[in-house]
Amino acid sequence: PERINPGDKQHRLPSIRKVTAGSNSTSAEFIDQLYQRIITAGTHKASSIKVAEAAKVIENTQRDLNIALINELAMLFNKLGIDTREVLDAAGSKWNFLPFSPGLVGGHCISVDPYYLTHKAQEIGYHPEVILAGRKINDGMGAYVAEQVIKLMTRKKIAVVDSKILVLGFTFKENCPDIRNTLVA
């Protein structure tokens, strides 16, 4: 499975450990050896293609859920009149706090991969509640941000109708030209 980080100048293809697999032991070994020549960070040979692909899907699903948690907390703190950034800075002073920021989740992986997993789960009769709840929160963030902008404009007595608003950050992450599944549009 693909493991790249577009726009990241530090974590490039050779420095990201690669999960490999094959349809049989011969092809798995060949593929693993091939990638070991390119990937200086090393490889992790999975026992099957299913395991390798499932690993990729949960990497992105975990990130999506972590962002959904922070998004939900940001909406809650907003209602409580507490500065989310200040809370995150304070919580980040603990060594094992995971640093995530609230915001829109788009792109071709993080916002899509959880749906592959939930679709497969539902095919076998399992209802993945937490994953779907996270997707619902993140899918709704575009509307939430728009509502907050309108509320702020109204409070500042800025006419909403016919206003022009500059949006900085149309892609799913900085320094990346990919606009697939952007929540800004």
Language model feature labels by segment:
Residues 1-185:
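Structural/interface elements that position substrates and couple domains in central-metabolism enzymes
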